[in-house]
Swiss-Prot record:
It comes from Mus musculus. Component of the centralspindlin complex that serves as a microtubule-dependent and Rho-mediated signaling required for the myosin contractile ring formation during the cell cycle cytokinesis. Required for proper attachment of the midbody to the cell membrane during cytokinesis. Sequentially binds to ECT2 and RAB11FIP3 which regulates cleavage furrow ingression and abscission during cytokinesis. Plays key roles in controlling cell growth and differentiation of hematopoietic cells through mechanisms other than regulating Rac GTPase activity. Has a critical role in erythropoiesis. The record marks R386 as: Arginine finger. This is Rac GTPase-activating protein 1. GO terms for molecular function: alpha-tubulin binding; beta-tubulin binding; gamma-tubulin binding; GTPase activator activity; microtubule binding; phosphatidylinositol-3,4,5-trisphosphate binding; protein kinase binding; protein-macromolecule adaptor activity. The modification N-acetylmethionine is found at M1. The modification Phosphoserine is found at S150, S155, S158, S165, S171, S204, S207, S215, S258, S388, S411. Phosphorylated at multiple sites in the midbody during cytokinesis. Phosphorylation by AURKB on Ser-388 at the midbody is, at least in part, responsible for exerting its latent GAP activity towards RhoA. Phosphorylation on multiple serine residues by PLK1 enhances its association with ECT2 and is critical for cleavage furrow formation. Phosphorylation on Ser-165 plays a major role in mediating interaction with ECT2. Phosphorylation on Ser-158 does not appear to contribute to binding to ECT2. Highly expressed in testis, thymus and spleen and weakly expressed in brain, heart, skeletal muscle and kidney. In testis, expression is restricted to germ cells with the highest levels of expression found in spermatocytes. Not detected in adult liver. Also expressed in fetal liver and in several hematopoietic cell lines. It comes from the Eukaryota. Induction: Expression is down-regulated during macrophage differentiation of M1 cells. The coiled coil region is indispensible for localization to the midbody during cytokinesis. The gene is Racgap1. Residues 274-283 have a biased composition (Polar residues). There is a cross-link at K249, K405 (Glycyl lysine isopeptide (Lys-Gly) (interchain with G-Cter in SUMO2)).
Length: 628
């Protein structure tokens, strides 16, 4: 009974308290606040739905625009395909007609015995044919006047021999070989020296003599003036070296007997204005071997950093793969450093030789790129090499250089100190310092010699004992640091540069030095760098000199790749197919003779001009990118 009363009393008290709360009116305020919160959430949800609808409309418009662009791209690809096929059919038909005209000329003009008597009508018809040939050749010259150096703009922009240009069936163009491209380029240069004069025709009436390295060919040239003047005939016998199918490698035509010659005209010497290009004043550095290319996938110009748009003409180096605008050609960084054949060891843990190619000068591409960019933008920057750049950016750039095949554009890096730190980091993290463990003691001892002449001689001896990669890289770096020290804006004299690069490029005398030895070596390292920077510039420049003639011969020989020997045939072989038309024509032989005479003159800086050499190196093309 008592328990029941207690429970009832407790329940009664709870009811009383709740009644008091209701009477006070607090519950209504809380309910109103909840309703307001729900209203705020409802408004936010409404705004979110409106924004969602807006973005859905924008997405729909973007999808529509993308679909329209896809259709345009598809039509453009189809149109390119159609135009390529149409041009190839026209070229095949043109080649067939040229072959027929060639045979007619051979019959009418190669008769030296005079058995064929030409009437006035026949002379008029023959002069008409000659005018047609001259006009067509001149038109071709105008068409290719801007690409005489490489002759690649009229090559198939969608296809090449690598079958990697576009994503359609490459079997459509496999029947049109590279020889036709070479023929078109050869024809485009027939009148490069000026307007055509009286047309001459040369035909072979002799046979090839099977000897060791040459063949003897007899030829007759008949000149028929278009104004009905007297007909001139010239007969010559020439000895020709076996043709290597490379106009850049074919030797000059040497006449061995000209007793039957009725008339002869010496070749006019070419003036400086006839040069196809002017080489840079490089002091013997390795030059770039440029070829022209029509851009399909947009690329960036290395000298100026701007994008090269679709369909524009660009230049690409065969060796280092550098890309530039034609007008930026003279601003490309030198020397030309070919890319590595394989992938080096872990980043920053390799020897210097792991990061260089086998071509001289043996300098890592990262060093060349950094130095060229620093000299372009950093010679007016105070504290160059003393101020550190962002470590994260330096690490990212280093990975791009050593992992990616293409060289990143350092012109897009705003902070020049990042590039300086990149160069120092690369040299610092090599397995073996630039001056090597083996020779570090010799360099230190040479720097401590009090007599300047003896110290310089000992330094020369130590430099000569370095591996070629270390020696070339050291020379390139010293040339650069001397330029930095000569710039007053950088405020980095030889002493300051020695403080930066002493511990970087000079090794310690022992593998694991203690603190005392490290402190002693630092002073000696500074003396070594100061002594190296005091050596004359001419001494370092000699390591940058390369024999451009040997480089060109290596390029032409495909880096000494073994191949099947060429068959000894006459350059004026039988006229049977359009491909053999490019073997020997009167105008092409005249041009090759003139190019040979031009190359025999004394070149600038002791090396042959690359502009004349490049004309004979058009049989190979680099892989074009995919068009997706």
């Amino acid at each position: 009974m008592d328990t029941t009363m207690v429970n009832l009393w407790t329940l009664f008290e709870q009811l009383v308290r709740r009644m008091e709360i209701i009477n006070e009116g607090n519950e209504s305020i809380e309910f109103i606040q909840v309703v307001k919160d729900f209203e705020d959430f409802r408004k936010k949800y409404q705004r979110t739905n409106q924004e969602l609808e807006k973005f859905k409309d924008l997405l729909l418009k973007a999808e529509t625009g993308r679909s329209a662009l896809d259709v345009k791209l598809k039509h453009a690809r189809n149109q390119v395909d159609v135009e390529i096929k149409r041009r190839q059919r026209a070229e095949a038909e043109c080649a067939k007609l040229e072959q027929q005209i060639q045979l007619i000329r051979d019959i009418l003009m190669c008769d030296t015995s005079g058995s064929i008597q030409l009437s006035e009508e026949q002379k008029s018809a023959l002069a008409f044919l000659n005018r047609g040939q001259a006009s067509s050749g001149h038109a071709g010259n105008n068409r290719l006047s801007t690409i005489d150096e490489s002759g690649s703009i009229l090559s198939d922009i969608s296809f090449d021999k690598t079958d990697e240009s576009l994503d359609w069936d490459s079997s459509l163009v496999k029947n049109f070989k590279m020889k036709k491209r070479e023929k078109r380029r050869s024809n485009s240069r027939q009148f490069i020296d000026g307007p055509p004069g009286p047309v001459k025709k040369t035909c072979s009436i002799g046979s090839t003599v099977d000897q060791a390295n040459e063949s003897i060919v007899a030829k007759t040239t008949v000149t028929v003036p278009s104004d009905g003047g007297p007909i001139e005939a010239v007969s010559t016998i020439e000895t020709l070296p076996s043709w290597t199918r490379s106009r850049g490698k074919s030797g000059p035509l040497q006449p061995v007997n000209s007793d039957s010659a009725l008339n002869s005209r010496p070749l006019e010497p070419r003036t400086d204005t006839d040069n196809l290009g002017t080489p840079q004043n490089t002091g013997g550095m390795r030059l770039h071997d440029f070829v022209s290319k029509t851009v399909i996938k947009p690329e960036s110009c290395v000298p100026c950093g701007k994008r090269i748009k679709f369909g524009k003409l660009s230049l690409k180096c065969r060796d280092c793969r550098l890309v530039s605008h034609p007008e930026c050609r003279d601003r490309c960084p030198l020397p030309c450093i070919p890319p590595l054949v394989g992938t080096p060891v872990k980043i920053g843990e390799g020897m210097l030789a792991d990061f260089v190619s086998q071509a001289s000068p043996m300098i890592p591409a990262i060093v060349v790129s950094c130095v060229n960019e620093i000299e372009q933008r950093g010679l007016t920057e105070a504290g160059l090499y003393r101020i550190s750049g962002c470590d994260r950016t330096v690490k990212e750039l280093k990975e791009k250089f050593l992992k990616v095949k293409t060289v990143p554009l350092l012109s897009k890096v705003d902070d020049i100190h990042v590039i300086c730190s990149l160069l120092k980091d690369f040299l610092r993290n090599l397995k073996e310092p630039l001056l090597t463990f083996w020779l570090s003691k010799a360099f230190m001892e040479a720097a401590e010699i009090t007599d300047e002449d003896n110290s310089t001689a000992a330094m020369y001896q130590a430099v000569s004992e370095l591996p070629q990669a270390n020696r070339d890289t050291l020379a390139f770096l010293m040339i650069h640091l001397q330029r930095v020290s000569q710039s007053p804006d950088t405020k980095m004299d030889i002493a300051n540069l020695a403080k930066v690069f002493g511990p970087t490029i000079v090794a310690h005398t022992v593998p694991n030095p203690d603190p005392v030895t490290m402190f002693q070596d630092i002073k000696r390292q500074l003396k070594v760098v100061e002594r190296l920077l005091s050596l004359p510039l001419e001494y370092w420049n000699q390591f940058m000199m390369v024999d451009q003639e040997n480089i060109d011969s290596q390029r032409g020989n495909g880096n000494s790749t073994p191949r099947t020997p060429d068959v000894k045939v006459s350059l004026l072989g039988p006229v049977t197919t359009p491909e053999f038309q490019l073997v020997k024509t009167p105008l092409s032989s005249s041009l090759s003779q003139r190019l040979y005479n031009l190359s025999k003159s004394t070149p600038r800086f002791g090396n042959k001009s690359k502009s004349a050499t490049n004309l004979g190196q058009q049989g190979k093309f680099f892989p074009a990118p995919y068009l997706k």
